[in-house]
């Protein structure tokens, strides 16, 4: 492991907006995120596989009336978003370092309002590990409030086609689905919605620079 990564790991251990917890144990603040961690009563939105936390931080700036929690196992990436949130005195943005496989250990029923899946690993050979698979949707249902939304933004045809199949097969209520987010679909968006999609992750910029078309959907589970 490089010295820079080690330094970032030591830094996030001191960051007040980063929580690290054992993977397989029930989190002591489960059900108490608003009260004990965010210290407010605002709705909580998750960014799963957040990487550098571009969406958690970006949405946090746009929606001060909501809490945003970026979740990833890569501490050196979380460092980027956590540092930016601290520098901007954002009390509505936090980060959790853990594996998404254990996500249900951290939240109580109905504790989360929305989920963003931004450029998740499409897992081409392991459909079960995709973050929109029945396995993971079942986990989200344990803590996502009734009528809570799942947002998916991706460059992957494989993941998006699979997600669309899950929506149709499972009968999820689909609010929005487009195979070309930045094409003519933009004409259907409000100014605020356009601003949301102007937030771009590191991977989106990378894939878009190579000509990938960005897809998006939003549905209830």
Where are these regions (language model features)?
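A short SAM/SAH-binding and catalytic strip from SAM-dependent methyltransferases
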Residues: 113-131
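A short glycine-rich, Lys/Arg-flanked "PGG" loop and its adjoining helix->strand segment in the class I
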Residues: 132-146
């Amino acid at each position: 492991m490089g010295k820079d990564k080690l330094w970032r790991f030591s830094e996030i251990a001191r960051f007040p907006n980063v929580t690290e917890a054992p993977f397989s144990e029930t989190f002591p603040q489960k059900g108490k995120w608003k009260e004990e961690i965010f210290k407010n009563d605002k709705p909580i939105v998750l960014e799963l596989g957040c990487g550098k936390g571009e969406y958690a931080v970006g949405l946090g700036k746009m929606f001060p009336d909501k809490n945003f929690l970026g979740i990833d196992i890569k501490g050196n990436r979380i460092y980027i978003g956590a540092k930016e949130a601290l520098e901007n005195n954002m009390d509505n943005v936090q980060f959790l370092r853990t594996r998404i496989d254990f996500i249900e250990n951290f939240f109580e029923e109905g504790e989360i309002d929305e989920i963003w899946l931004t450029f998740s690993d499409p897992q081409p050979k392991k459909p079960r590990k995709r973050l929109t698979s029945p396995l993971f949707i079942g986990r989200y249902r344990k803590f996502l409030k009734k009528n809570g939304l799942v947002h998916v933004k991706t460059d992957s045809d494989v993941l998006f086609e699979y997600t669309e199949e899950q929506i149709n097969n499972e009968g999820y209520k689909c609010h929005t689905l487009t195979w070309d987010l930045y094409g003519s679909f933009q004409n259907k968006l409000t100014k605020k919605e356009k601003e949301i999609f102007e937030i771009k992750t590191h991977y989106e910029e990378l894939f878009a620079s190579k000509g990938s078309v960005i897809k998006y959907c939003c549905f209830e589970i």
